[in-house]
Amino acid sequence: MITLLIADDHPLYRDALRGALSLSLPALTLKEAGDLNTTVDILNNEDIDLLLLDLHMPGSNDLFGLLHIRKLFPELPVAVVSGTEDTTLISKIISVGTLGFIPKTASAQDIANAVEAILDGDVWLPDNLSEDVDELNEEFSELADKVASLTPSQYKVLCYMRDGLLNKQIGFNLDIAEATVKAHVTAIFKKLGINNRTQAVLIASQLE
């Protein structure tokens, strides 16, 4: 029995995806998660054969969730399900080892075809995007490894730095001491191999 995890914070879309997959691939066992923490918990405690991941859900509003999961579960087949048509972003998604990109506008048959192809070990992209997406984005792949080493708390601090907040403001938003924020910033700089906030902002901007 093949078990698939749908990770998306929109219950209506999860229901629609579940319905489409149940009709086309009735042998699948389907699990659901609505945020990054729940997704990681399920992956830690259950045998999942394929993860269908939305990039934008609580715990991750950009590529961090994908990078975090790829770091924790490097052997897990992952496909991103998203409404974006940004080929640069899709190229980044594929470059970090993701096996597929499924548009949220895809038909039930296309979704089933994608799942079957990915379970067979193939990379699946929609026909209209396959020629435009550069699968070998080595520069971003190297950056992704560094970003994936951040903890979720460090990632939140990095996002606030990207938004231009000072340490005191970040501490207020996260309800932590300013000294703790400074410790996170130091760790972020070390893990990313940088030495100032401007460089951190440039890196964070590439995750959007």
PLM feature segments, named:
Residues 9, 81-85, 104-106:
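Conserved active-site segment of CheY-like receiver
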Residues 32-50, 64:
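Acidic, metal-coordinating helix/loop segments flanking the phosphotransfer/catalytic sites
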Residues 54-55, 82:
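Active-site residues of response regulator receiver
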Residues 58-61:
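The feature encodes the CheY-like receiver
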Residues 63-75:
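Short amphipathic alpha-helix used as the core "switch/output" element in two-component signaling
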Residues 90-94, 100-147:
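Short, flexible helix-to-coil linker/hinge segments that flank and couple to helix-turn-helix
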Residues 141-178:
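Helix-turn-helix DNA-binding segment
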Residues 186-208:
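Basic, Lys/Arg-enriched C-terminal extension of HTH/homeodomain DNA-binding domains
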